[in-house]
């Protein structure tokens, strides 16, 4: 079983050019929309409609991606302006073949989360993004916040799981068991962007 303190966190980078050479082989999440969100609420702030998260990602990736690196593109699955297939095609064109559902609705709970789910802007949309990416040959990571979500992610063939920041020890134990069925295992979101 993993506790939050022993589970490896996945670094979040906002600028690929600033990625140190020694990080080329370590699993990293690229999310340019996290730039300037140094506080601990970055995972919910990045969901706000104050920027075009996927355009910022695609713009950063157009600068070049090392194909052998373990950089996973943080794709906002709830993008109201782009279809998943179009985002994935743009990633492919940029030479990126790794995707994670981040920013993610896992940062939201309560009535807001239920409303998003009711309108089709929830976990279902995120799983559809990952499912489509896998079908197109992408390696994927899934940010998860429930056993059911983790179970579905593993069933569709994700390469690894990332525990949402609010995951408790019982959830981490469940995720850890499921992550044994993946090639990359289990990570956690960091406490802050740039933190571990």
Swiss-Prot record:
Gene3D superfamilies named among the record's database cross-references: Aldolase class I (3.20.20.70)
Cross-referenced SUPFAM superfamilies: Phosphoenolpyruvate/pyruvate domain
Keywords: Plasmid
InterPro entries linked: Aldolase_TIM, Pyrv/PenolPyrv_kinase-like_dom, TIM-br_IGPS-like, Tobamovirus_resist_UPF0261
GO MF annotation: an example: catalytic activity
Protein origin, superkingdom: Bacteria
Cysteines engaged in disulfide bonds, as pairs: none
Membrane-spanning ranges: none
Signal peptide positions (record): none
PANTHER family referenced in this protein's UniProt entry, alphabetically: UPF0261 DOMAIN PROTEIN (AFU_ORTHOLOGUE AFUA_1G10120)
Name assigned to this protein: Uncharacterized protein y4oT
């Amino acid at each position: 079983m993993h506790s939050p303190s022993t589970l490896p966190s996945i670094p979040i980078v906002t600028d690929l050019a600033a990625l140190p050479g020694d990080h080329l082989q370590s699993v990293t999440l690229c999310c340019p929309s996290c730039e300037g969100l140094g506080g601990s609420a970055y995972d919910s702030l990045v969901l706000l409609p104050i920027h075009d998260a996927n355009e910022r990602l695609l713009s950063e990736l157009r600068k070049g991606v090392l194909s052998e690196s373990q950089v996973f593109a943080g794709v906002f699955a709830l993008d109201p302006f782009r279809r998943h297939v179009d985002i994935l095609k743009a990633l492919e064109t940029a030479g990126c073949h790794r995707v994670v559902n981040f920013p993610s609705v896992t940062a939201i709970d309560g009535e807001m989360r239920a409303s998003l789910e009711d309108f089709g802007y929830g976990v279902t949309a995120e799983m559809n993004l990952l499912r489509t990416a896998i079908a197109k040959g992408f390696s994927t990571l899934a940010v998860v916040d429930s056993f059911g979500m983790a179970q579905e992610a593993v069933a569709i063939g994700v390469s690894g799981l990332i525990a949402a920041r609010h995951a408790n020890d019982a959830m981490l134990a469940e995720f850890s068991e499921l992550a044994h069925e993946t090639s990359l295992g289990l990570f956690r979101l960091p406490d802050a962007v740039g933190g571990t």
